Each structure stands twice: as structure tokens, then as C-alpha cells.
Curated annotation (Swiss-Prot):
Belongs to the universal ribosomal protein uS11 family. It holds the Pfam family Ribosomal_S11. It comes from Anopheles gambiae. This is Small ribosomal subunit protein uS11A. It comes from the Eukaryota. NCBIfam families: PRK09607.1. Residues 143-152 have a biased composition (Basic residues). GO terms for cellular component: cytosolic small ribosomal subunit. Keywords: Ribonucleoprotein, Ribosomal protein. One of its GO terms (molecular function) is structural constituent of ribosome. InterPro entries: Ribosomal_uS11, Ribosomal_uS11_CS, Ribosomal_uS11_sf.
């Protein structure tokens, strides 16, 4: 004899949102860490504490050729991807931390920095603070190239 189905309790599935619980029109901030070297561009969005990664996309993930990883076009595609993911999780505004290689290497950001920042701004994300977090040494180790420098 089969067990009766009358006693079975129907469980309701609760939808779980990964994003914060906010009202419409409320501004929710994340932090976009843009690392632009001359070989690649990383666009990495975290929560305000910086511990929880929301999305991370690089220029190399968006283009096929190795030489195009650091290009402004690849950085733009990466930033658009990240912005789309942020919107789906409920993040509406970003603080931006821009970083170059730094240390005893170049202190200027690569070619993808400007276009990544621009793409984030154009994708209807509000921009909070823009900060340069390139590591600058107070007294560096000796730079490569020797006494007479790099000869071309």
C-alpha cells in the first residue's frame, strides 16, 4: 500500500539575492580596482571593505591576440562586462582605485586605464571617488639597466 500524500508539506522556495537588499533609487557603492600595466589591464570590483570580490575581468579574457591585452579596446570590453555584472547584483555606484605597476618600475598607468574608467562612467554607473594607489617607494631598490642605463 502506498503512503498517503495528504500529510506532505509543500516547501516554498525563497529567492536568494547575492546583492544587498535596497530600495529603488538608493545608491549602493562598490570599489573598482583598475590595474593598468603595459602588458594587461585588470578591472576588479569588490565590496567597500575590499574583501569580497564581485567581479574580475582582464583585457586578456576579452581579446585573442596577446599583443592586444593591454589595449584600450580590451580594457573597455572588460569594464563593460564588470559594469553589467555589478548592475545585476544591485551595485549602482563605484569608487575607483587606479594603479600602475609602480615600485621600481614605471609609475604611469598603461594605455587601458583611461578607457576602462571611461567605460565604467558611460555604463550608467555613478562614480564616487577616483584615487591613484600606485605603490611609490620612499627609497627604492636599484632599478634594472645598469650604471649606463638601457641603450637603444
Amino acid at each position: 500500500m502506498a503512503p498517503s500524500r495528504k500529510n506532505k508539506v509543500v516547501k516554498e522556495e525563497v529567492q536568494v539575492s547575492l546583492g544587498p537588499q535596497v530600495r529603488d533609487g538608493e545608491v549602493v557603492f562598490g570599489v573598482a580596482h583598475i590595474y593598468a600595466s603595459f602588458n594587461d589591464t585588470f578591472v576588479h570590483v569588490t565590496d567597500l571593505s575590499g574583501k569580497e570580490t564581485i567581479s574580475r575581468v582582464t583585457g586578456g579574457m576579452k581579446v585573442k591576440a596577446d599583443r592586444d591585452e593591454a589595449s584600450p579596446y580590451a580594457a573597455m570590453l572588460a569594464a563593460q562586462d564588470v559594469a553589467e555584472k555589478c548592475k545585476s547584483l544591485g551595485i549602482t555606484a563605484l569608487h575607483i582605485k587606479l594603479r600602475a605597476t609602480g615600485g621600481n618600475r614605471t609609475k604611469t598607468p598603461g594605455p587601458g586605464a583611461q578607457s576602462a574608467l571611461r567605460a565604467l562612467a558611460r555604463s550608467s554607473m555613478k562614480i564616487g571617488r577616483i584615487e591613484d594607489v600606485t605603490p611609490i617607494p620612499s627609497d627604492s631598490t636599484r632599478r634594472k639597466g645598469g650604471r649606463r642605463g638601457r641603450r637603444l
